[in-house]
Amino acid sequence: MCKRIVGLLLFMVLLCMPLRAESMYRDTCYSLRTDVGYAYNIVYGHHATFNMGAMLPINRNFEGEISARATTANTYTIGLRVQPKFPIKRNDKDCGEVLLETHVLYNRFQRNHMHGLAAAFSVGYRWEYVYAKVGYGMSMMAAMVMSQHTTENSIFEPHNLVYYLEIFARPHTSSWNISACITDMTDFQMERMFTPIFILRSYVDVTEQWRLYFSGQCKPVGIANQAASFFGAEMSTGASYRF
Protein backbone atom coordinates (compact mmCIF):
# COMPACT_ATOMS: atom_id res chain seq x y z
CA MET A 1 0.00 0.00 0.00
CA CYS A 2 2.70 2.52 0.99
CA LYS A 3 4.78 1.73 -2.13
CA ARG A 4 1.77 2.37 -4.37
CA ILE A 5 1.09 5.72 -2.69
CA VAL A 6 4.71 6.84 -3.08
CA GLY A 7 4.78 5.76 -6.73
CA LEU A 8 1.58 7.61 -7.64
CA LEU A 9 2.72 10.75 -5.85
CA LEU A 10 6.09 10.80 -7.62
CA PHE A 11 4.34 10.38 -10.97
CA MET A 12 2.09 13.38 -10.29
CA VAL A 13 5.09 15.46 -9.22
CA LEU A 14 6.92 14.72 -12.48
CA LEU A 15 3.89 15.92 -14.43
CA CYS A 16 3.91 19.21 -12.54
CA MET A 17 7.64 20.01 -12.77
CA PRO A 18 7.61 22.00 -16.05
CA LEU A 19 5.37 24.72 -14.63
CA ARG A 20 6.64 28.12 -13.58
CA ALA A 21 9.67 28.36 -11.29
CA GLU A 22 8.88 31.24 -8.96
CA SER A 23 6.21 30.97 -6.30
CA MET A 24 3.24 33.28 -6.08
CA TYR A 25 2.50 32.13 -2.51
CA ARG A 26 5.24 34.04 -0.73
CA ASP A 27 3.06 36.12 1.55
CA THR A 28 0.61 34.99 4.18
CA CYS A 29 -2.91 35.43 2.84
CA TYR A 30 -6.48 34.29 3.26
CA SER A 31 -7.05 30.99 1.52
CA LEU A 32 -9.49 28.08 1.30
CA ARG A 33 -8.54 24.50 0.57
CA THR A 34 -10.37 21.25 -0.03
CA ASP A 35 -9.28 17.73 -0.87
CA VAL A 36 -10.58 14.20 -1.21
CA GLY A 37 -8.75 11.00 -0.49
CA TYR A 38 -8.75 7.25 -0.18
CA ALA A 39 -7.74 5.50 3.04
CA TYR A 40 -7.50 1.99 4.41
CA ASN A 41 -6.83 0.30 7.74
CA ILE A 42 -7.74 -2.95 9.45
CA VAL A 43 -10.34 -1.27 11.68
CA TYR A 44 -12.46 0.67 9.15
CA GLY A 45 -11.38 -1.02 5.92
CA HIS A 46 -11.60 0.97 2.67
CA HIS A 47 -13.11 4.44 3.00
CA ALA A 48 -13.04 7.93 1.52
CA THR A 49 -11.99 11.17 3.22
CA PHE A 50 -13.25 14.71 2.64
CA ASN A 51 -11.26 17.62 4.07
CA MET A 52 -11.73 21.38 4.13
CA GLY A 53 -9.70 24.19 5.66
CA ALA A 54 -9.39 27.96 5.86
CA MET A 55 -6.25 29.99 6.54
CA LEU A 56 -7.11 33.17 8.45
CA PRO A 57 -4.07 35.41 8.96
CA ILE A 58 -4.49 38.43 11.21
CA ASN A 59 -1.24 39.97 10.00
CA ARG A 60 2.14 38.84 8.64
CA ASN A 61 3.20 37.65 12.10
CA PHE A 62 0.08 35.84 13.29
CA GLU A 63 -2.18 33.37 11.55
CA GLY A 64 -4.93 30.94 12.39
CA GLU A 65 -6.32 27.90 10.60
CA ILE A 66 -9.62 26.04 10.88
CA SER A 67 -9.98 22.58 9.37
CA ALA A 68 -12.62 19.85 9.21
CA ARG A 69 -12.73 16.25 8.06
CA ALA A 70 -15.48 13.71 7.40
CA THR A 71 -15.05 10.13 6.24
CA THR A 72 -17.34 7.41 4.94
CA ALA A 73 -16.30 5.41 8.03
CA ASN A 74 -18.41 7.83 10.13
CA THR A 75 -15.45 9.57 11.75
CA TYR A 76 -15.29 13.34 12.00
CA THR A 77 -12.62 15.85 13.03
CA ILE A 78 -12.50 19.59 13.68
CA GLY A 79 -9.12 21.28 14.12
CA LEU A 80 -7.98 24.73 15.22
CA ARG A 81 -4.42 26.01 14.90
CA VAL A 82 -3.01 29.40 15.95
CA GLN A 83 0.55 30.34 15.13
CA PRO A 84 2.49 33.51 15.99
CA LYS A 85 5.55 33.90 13.75
CA PHE A 86 8.80 35.73 14.46
CA PRO A 87 11.07 36.42 11.45
CA ILE A 88 14.82 36.06 11.97
CA LYS A 89 17.21 38.40 10.17
CA ARG A 90 20.98 38.68 10.25
CA ASN A 91 22.72 41.56 8.49
CA ASP A 92 19.42 42.33 6.74
CA LYS A 93 19.32 38.78 5.40
CA ASP A 94 16.31 36.53 5.92
CA CYS A 95 17.23 33.55 8.09
CA GLY A 96 13.83 31.92 8.45
CA GLU A 97 11.25 32.29 11.18
CA VAL A 98 10.43 30.90 14.62
CA LEU A 99 6.86 29.76 15.21
CA LEU A 100 4.88 29.19 18.41
CA GLU A 101 1.99 26.87 17.64
CA THR A 102 -1.13 25.80 19.52
CA HIS A 103 -3.07 23.00 17.85
CA VAL A 104 -6.38 21.56 19.13
CA LEU A 105 -8.31 18.62 17.64
CA TYR A 106 -11.78 17.26 18.37
CA ASN A 107 -12.41 13.75 17.01
CA ARG A 108 -15.75 11.96 16.87
CA PHE A 109 -15.86 8.21 16.19
CA GLN A 110 -19.55 7.78 15.51
CA ARG A 111 -19.38 4.05 14.79
CA ASN A 112 -17.65 3.40 18.11
CA HIS A 113 -19.75 5.90 20.10
CA MET A 114 -16.55 7.58 21.27
CA HIS A 115 -15.09 11.05 20.98
CA GLY A 116 -11.74 12.56 21.85
CA LEU A 117 -9.84 15.79 22.35
CA ALA A 118 -6.15 16.41 21.68
CA ALA A 119 -4.02 19.51 22.15
CA ALA A 120 -0.39 20.30 21.43
CA PHE A 121 1.90 23.26 22.09
CA SER A 122 5.11 23.45 20.08
CA VAL A 123 8.03 25.64 19.02
CA GLY A 124 9.07 25.47 15.39
CA TYR A 125 11.57 26.79 12.89
CA ARG A 126 11.00 27.19 9.15
CA TRP A 127 13.53 28.15 6.52
CA GLU A 128 14.07 27.44 2.83
CA TYR A 129 14.48 23.67 2.88
CA VAL A 130 13.32 22.62 6.33
CA TYR A 131 10.35 22.94 8.65
CA ALA A 132 10.82 21.49 12.15
CA LYS A 133 8.94 21.75 15.43
CA VAL A 134 8.85 20.02 18.79
CA GLY A 135 6.50 20.37 21.70
CA TYR A 136 4.19 18.92 24.32
CA GLY A 137 0.85 17.23 23.70
CA MET A 138 -2.00 15.62 25.60
CA SER A 139 -5.12 13.71 24.60
CA MET A 140 -8.22 12.06 26.01
CA MET A 141 -10.98 9.80 24.70
CA ALA A 142 -14.32 8.85 26.26
CA ALA A 143 -17.78 7.47 25.50
CA MET A 144 -20.23 9.95 23.98
CA VAL A 145 -22.97 9.15 26.52
CA MET A 146 -22.19 10.69 29.90
CA SER A 147 -23.71 7.75 31.79
CA GLN A 148 -21.15 5.46 30.15
CA HIS A 149 -18.11 7.43 31.34
CA THR A 150 -16.15 4.92 33.39
CA THR A 151 -12.53 4.06 33.93
CA GLU A 152 -12.87 1.24 31.42
CA ASN A 153 -14.10 3.35 28.49
CA SER A 154 -12.32 6.66 29.02
CA ILE A 155 -8.58 7.22 28.59
CA PHE A 156 -6.43 10.24 29.40
CA GLU A 157 -2.87 10.62 28.15
CA PRO A 158 -1.41 13.69 29.88
CA HIS A 159 2.10 13.59 28.43
CA ASN A 160 3.26 13.19 24.85
CA LEU A 161 6.19 14.46 22.83
CA VAL A 162 5.01 16.15 19.63
CA TYR A 163 7.50 16.38 16.77
CA TYR A 164 7.50 17.35 13.10
CA LEU A 165 10.31 17.35 10.55
CA GLU A 166 9.73 18.15 6.88
CA ILE A 167 12.50 18.40 4.28
CA PHE A 168 11.84 20.16 0.94
CA ALA A 169 13.53 19.43 -2.38
CA ARG A 170 13.36 23.15 -3.28
CA PRO A 171 12.87 26.33 -1.20
CA HIS A 172 9.39 26.15 0.32
CA THR A 173 8.42 29.38 -1.47
CA SER A 174 8.93 27.77 -4.89
CA SER A 175 6.05 27.40 -7.31
CA TRP A 176 6.35 23.60 -7.20
CA ASN A 177 7.91 21.35 -4.65
CA ILE A 178 8.13 17.89 -3.15
CA SER A 179 8.80 17.10 0.49
CA ALA A 180 9.23 14.18 2.89
CA CYS A 181 7.99 14.39 6.46
CA ILE A 182 8.00 12.38 9.69
CA THR A 183 5.68 13.43 12.51
CA ASP A 184 3.26 12.21 15.16
CA MET A 185 0.66 14.97 14.65
CA THR A 186 -1.07 16.06 11.46
CA ASP A 187 -4.03 18.30 10.69
CA PHE A 188 -6.45 15.58 11.81
CA GLN A 189 -4.68 13.24 14.24
CA MET A 190 -2.22 13.05 17.10
CA GLU A 191 -0.32 9.84 17.78
CA ARG A 192 1.94 8.72 20.57
CA MET A 193 5.54 9.75 20.08
CA PHE A 194 6.66 6.21 19.21
CA THR A 195 4.02 5.91 16.45
CA PRO A 196 5.48 7.99 13.60
CA ILE A 197 3.54 8.99 10.49
CA PHE A 198 5.51 9.11 7.23
CA ILE A 199 4.27 11.63 4.66
CA LEU A 200 5.26 12.44 1.08
CA ARG A 201 3.81 15.67 -0.36
CA SER A 202 3.96 17.77 -3.50
CA TYR A 203 2.30 20.91 -4.79
CA VAL A 204 2.26 23.13 -7.86
CA ASP A 205 1.01 26.71 -8.38
CA VAL A 206 -1.03 26.77 -11.58
CA THR A 207 -2.15 30.43 -11.35
CA GLU A 208 -1.68 33.33 -8.97
CA GLN A 209 -4.64 32.12 -6.92
CA TRP A 210 -4.80 28.35 -7.45
CA ARG A 211 -2.51 25.68 -6.02
CA LEU A 212 -2.86 21.93 -6.59
CA TYR A 213 -1.35 19.50 -4.13
CA PHE A 214 -0.97 15.77 -3.56
CA SER A 215 -0.20 13.80 -0.43
CA GLY A 216 0.47 10.21 0.56
CA GLN A 217 1.03 8.95 4.07
CA CYS A 218 1.35 5.69 5.95
CA LYS A 219 1.57 4.64 9.56
CA PRO A 220 3.01 1.16 10.10
CA VAL A 221 1.66 0.76 13.66
CA GLY A 222 -0.78 2.44 16.01
CA ILE A 223 -4.22 1.18 14.99
CA ALA A 224 -4.94 -0.28 18.43
CA ASN A 225 -3.90 2.59 20.70
CA GLN A 226 -6.36 5.21 21.90
CA ALA A 227 -4.78 8.05 19.94
CA ALA A 228 -4.77 6.14 16.66
CA SER A 229 -6.44 7.79 13.71
CA PHE A 230 -8.72 6.33 11.09
CA PHE A 231 -6.18 4.91 8.68
CA GLY A 232 -2.94 3.06 8.27
CA ALA A 233 -2.40 4.50 4.78
CA GLU A 234 -3.96 7.35 2.84
CA MET A 235 -3.54 9.27 -0.38
CA SER A 236 -5.31 12.51 -1.27
CA THR A 237 -5.39 15.31 -3.79
CA GLY A 238 -6.93 18.75 -3.66
CA ALA A 239 -6.67 22.44 -4.36
CA SER A 240 -6.44 25.73 -2.50
CA TYR A 241 -7.54 29.21 -3.54
CA ARG A 242 -5.79 32.35 -2.33
CA PHE A 243 -7.75 35.58 -1.97
Set out the residue ranges of the language-model regions.
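Cleavable N-terminal export/targeting peptides
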Residues: 1-31, 243
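Short glycine/proline- and aromatic-enriched beta-strand/turn motifs that initiate or cap beta-hairpins
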Residues: 21-72, 242
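Residues that define the transmembrane beta-barrel architecture of outer-membrane proteins
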Residues: 30, 44-50, 74-80, 96-98, ...
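Residues on the lipid-exposed face of transmembrane beta-strands in outer-membrane beta-barrel proteins
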Residues: 36-38, 52-56, 80-86, 119-127, ...
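Repeated loop/turn-to-beta-strand initiation elements of outer-membrane beta-barrel proteins
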Residues: 59-66, 88-100, 128-134, 140-142, ...
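Detector for outer-membrane/organellar transmembrane beta-barrel domains
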Residues: 116-188
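Predominantly the C-terminal beta-signal and adjacent terminal strand-loop region
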Residues: 180-184, 189-243
